[in-house]
Design a protein with these regions (language model features):
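Aromatic- and acidic-residue-enriched segments that line the glycan-binding/catalytic groove
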Residues: 54-68, 100-145, 183-215
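The substrate-binding groove and active-site-proximal loops of carbohydrate-active enzymes
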Residues: 9-22, 59-75, 146-164, 218-231, ...
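Aromatic-lined substrate-binding rim segments of carbohydrate-active enzymes
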Residues: 31, 49-97, 220-246, 300
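Active-site-adjacent "subsite" loops/lids of carbohydrate-active enzymes
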Residues: 2-22, 93-169, 173
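Aromatic-lined carbohydrate-binding/catalytic grooves of carbohydrate-active enzymes
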Residues: 38-73, 192-197, 289-309
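Aromatic-lined carbohydrate-recognition surfaces of secreted/lumenal glycan-active proteins
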Residues: 5-7, 91-103, 180-187, 223-267, ...
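Substrate-binding cleft of secreted/luminal carbohydrate-active enzymes
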Residues: 41-46, 272-298, 306, 314-397
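Catalytic domains of carbohydrate-active enzymes, especially glycoside hydrolases
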Residues: 25-57, 170-179, 273, 279-285, ...
């Protein structure tokens, strides 16, 4: 069984015909296509950003494409998607993120040289109310001066609670079968892989455990990375309890390997603990934060951090995918109830490679993106400009 990952906002903003997914009828037809052509038995539905309390901002003459996408949708995807997915024999899952809380609009002189992407992400921004109300939760460097915008430190119990409350508020009233928590981030990459994470709760926990203040003294870096990773496990454990009460399942998706990776850092990715403790039902590996899975443009191409012990962008510290699955993931997954899926949204379609992966012991299936499959003409044109307002709209503003 494969999974189809659907970023609804990308479809509405850049899709064509049925691939725009702007009506329930179009969705119904594409669900059957995903089932029959992609072998999908489940759908990960990434909702519109407008469901998360936050603020859009834009330079004069622009509007955020996500803000535009949210306008004029006269149907409730949270009601329609689960029902139609089941009619098509697909299990519906709600797709959410944890390290993708956005950022305020940067000054013009900064945007000239540093931006998410030049086609539709240079002169617009969005930031969650959660990080506007709690800026201290953003991960901070050792000097306490610089923060990674959009990335919340999970060392704060209150921050973890806020995420669990947000997600449960979204999924509990719906008929989605489970929650897919994606660890990808669209935030500006850290300059170095161990730059951030020195928030007060983490500093205090390390001091209590080892007697060392990481902001003033030399410390064992592996122990520090493990501590940072433990907060992610704490979040997943707390979320698991809430989801089980509601009768919902849990899937986690991230990079492959043992660290969170670009653009975030070297914090340990303790997936073995999640499997051992039965905290997740599904694990998706081989994700990529540095490239859009729909349009394939590079995010923050002028920023590529250094110092990663494992880096999926250049292969540092990683074996081949096939070897990694067979030698590392399979032995851990084999004696568990966790299902392992391999993300393919960042790969050219290859029936041979896909068949080999599906035949690899331990692999339950693959994850494909819907956008490129549904919009081949738009993909060929490769024109993803959006956000610039027509002249009449600019004058009215």
């Amino acid at each position: 069984m494969n999974i189809v990952s659907v970023s609804w906002g990308d479809h509405i903003s850049f899709g064509e015909g049925d691939g725009k997914l702007d009506t329930p009828e179009k969705l119904r037809r594409r669900l059957a296509v995903w089932r029959d052509e992609l072998g999908a038995g489940a759908v990960h539905w990434r909702m519109l950003r407008s469901r998360i309390p936050g603020t859009y901002s834009a330079a004069p003459g622009y509007r955020h494409p996500s803000e535009t996408a949210a306008r004029g949708q006269g149907w409730d995807d949270f009601e329609i998607v689960p029902a139609m997915a089941r009619e098509a024999s697909l299990s519906p899952w709600l797709y959410v993120t944890v390290w993708d809380e956005g950022w305020p609009l940067a000054p013009e002189q900064v945007r000239r040289v540093s931006y998410h992407n030049e086609m539709h992400g240079q002169h617009v921004a969005w930031q969650s109310d959660l990080t506007r109300d709690h800026p201290q939760w953003l991960t901070v460097d050792g000097a306490g001066r610089e923060r990674q915008l959009g990335v919340v430190s999970l060392a704060y119990p209150e921050a973890r609670h806020a995420f669990v409350q947000r997600w449960m508020g979204l999924i509990e009233p719906t008929e989605f079968d489970g929650l897919f928590v994606c660890l990808r981030s669209q935030s500006r990459p850290a300059d170095t892989a161990d730059q951030f994470g020195f928030n007060e709760p983490a500093r205090r926990d390390f001091l209590d455990r080892y007697g060392i203040d990481v902001t003033r003294e030399a410390f064992v870096i592996d122990a520090w990375r493990d501590l940072l990773g433990s907060y992610l496990t704490a979040l997943i454990g707390e979320l698991r309890v809430a989801l089980e009460r509601a009768g919902k399942r849990l899937a986690i998706g991230g990079a492959r390997g043992d660290v969170v990776g670009p653009p975030l850092g070297n914090a340990t990715l303790p997936w073995r603990d999640w499997v051992r403790l039965n905290l997740v039902d599904r694990l998706v590996i081989n994700q990529n934060s540095s490239q859009c899975p729909s349009m394939w443009h590079q995010l923050w191409p002028m920023h590529r951090g250094t110092g990663y012990v494992q880096n999926y962008l250049d292969g540092t510290g990683l074996p081949s995918l096939a070897e990694h699955v067979s030698e590392t993931y399979r032995p851990v997954i084999a004696d568990s109830r966790v299902k392992l899926f391999v993300a393919r949204q960042w790969c050219e379609r290859s029936p041979e490679a896909e068949a080999r992966l599906c035949a690899t012991p331990g692999v339950a299936g693959l994850v494909f993106g819907s956008f490129r499959h549904d919009n081949p003409d738009a993909v060929r044109r490769n024109d993803w400009r959006a956000g610039r307002l027509p002249r009449d709209d600019q004058q009215r503003r």
